[in-house]
């Protein structure tokens, strides 16, 4: 089996690549080739090839997706705050990039499997709680609108038999390793990651702010399970909510204290940032993932697990 991860240089892409290599199989078939592709050459990984791919450029996409490509994980995107600030670039990457990948897959005529990552940012506006697979997508930000459009494309290309598609609306992934990015949700990892590493972090919202979370470890497990779901079991809508859990910022901090003690809490500064609050307070959190749960995908049992996974998998060693 030949697998391509577009967005293979990112946190989830790197972890997904490593897990697939560890398994050696996908859907019961041996992985013969794994390619990590991104806008810049991803970090090298033993057992995988790396290449550059600009999904906004059809020629670049065509060079990456070959007739031998069996499975495409489409993870690449520009994130929420960036897409909000740069309207044109958001649509160029998040909408037209998705179109370019699907159109290349269609042109091959081989019906590759496409696993698309959407986002809980598709929810918003006047849709009624609780939200889930059949809720109206009514994002109040450009990033969510672009992801909603991507879901519709994946559904239509799948309906026409051009690809074997499936899409998953990711919860906010926390605790993410690395450095803060331009996502409005970036602080939802940094207020834990930085203090766990002995560094100060700023929280721009109050402790009562509620959100919907999943750990990187569970996200990767779910993407692999999602790729292995039989096409017949997906139904007419091949895109669905990935399971997560709702917690407040205060509960996240309490979980960190339970796992790592009281010292990291002293490194959090609570400072309101209206430009971030304006985005994240438009997001929704009362979200249910009934379809994915029935298909075998899972959420973390507690946020203490999320903290432990970061310490086990990602915390830099002194």
Residue ranges and their predicted role:
Residues 3-26:
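N-terminal Rossmann NAD(P)H-binding glycine-rich loop of SDR-like oxidoreductase domains
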Residues 55-93:
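NAD(P)H-binding glycine-rich loop region in Rossmannoid oxidoreductase-like domains
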Residues 99-141:
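Conserved Rossmann-fold NAD(P)-dependent oxidoreductase catalytic core, especially the SDR/UDP-sugar
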Residues 151-177:
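Conserved beta-loop-beta element that borders a ligand/cofactor-binding pocket
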Residues 171-185, 205-218:
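Glycine-rich "substrate-gating" loop/helix at the edge of Rossmann-like oxidoreductase active sites
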Residues 188-202, 210-239:
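Alpha-helical substrate-binding/gating segment
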Residues 218, 222-277:
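Mid/C-terminal beta-alpha module of Rossmann-like enzyme folds, strongest
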Residues 272, 284-294, 301-318:
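Amphipathic terminal alpha-helices
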């Amino acid at each position: 089996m030949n697998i391509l991860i577009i967005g293979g240089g990112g946190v989830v892409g790197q972890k997904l690549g490593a897990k697939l290599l560890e398994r050696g199989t996908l859907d019961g078939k041996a992985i013969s080739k794994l390619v990590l592709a991104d806008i810049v050459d991803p970090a090298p990984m033993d057992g995988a090839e790396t290449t550059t791919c600009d999904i906004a450029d059809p020629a670049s996409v065509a060079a990456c997706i070959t007739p031998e490509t069996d499975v495409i994980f489409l993870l690449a995107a520009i994130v929420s705050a960036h897409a909000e600030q740069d309207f044109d670039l958001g649509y160029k990457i998040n909408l037209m990039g998705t179109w370019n990948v699907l159109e290349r897959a269609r042109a091959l005529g081989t019906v590759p499997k496409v696993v698309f990552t959407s986002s809980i940012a598709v929810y918003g506006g006047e849709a009624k709680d609780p939200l889930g697979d059949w809720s109206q997508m009514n994002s109040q930000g450009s990033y969510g609108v672009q992801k909603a459009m991507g879901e519709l494309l994946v559904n239509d290309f799948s309906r026409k038999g051009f690809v074997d598609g499936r899409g998953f609306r990711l919860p906010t992934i926390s605790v993410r390793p690395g450095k803060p990015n331009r996502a409005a949700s970036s602080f939802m990892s940094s207020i834990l990651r930085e203090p766990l590493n002995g560094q100060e972090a700023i929280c721009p919202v109050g402790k009562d702010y509620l959100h919907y979370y999943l750990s990187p470890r569970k996200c990767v497990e779910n993407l692999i399970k999602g790729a292995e779901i039989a096409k017949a079991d997906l139904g007419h809508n091949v895109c669905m909510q990935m399971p997560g859990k709702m917690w407040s910022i205060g509960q996240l901090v309490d979980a960190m204290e339970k796992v790592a003690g009281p010292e990291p809490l002293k490194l959090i500064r609570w400072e309101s940032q209206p430009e971030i609050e304006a985005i994240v307070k438009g997001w929704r959190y009362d979200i249910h993932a009934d379809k994915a749960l029935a298909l075998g995908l899972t959420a973390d049992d507690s946020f203490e697990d999320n903290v432990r996974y970061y310490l086990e998998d990602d915390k830099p060693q002194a």
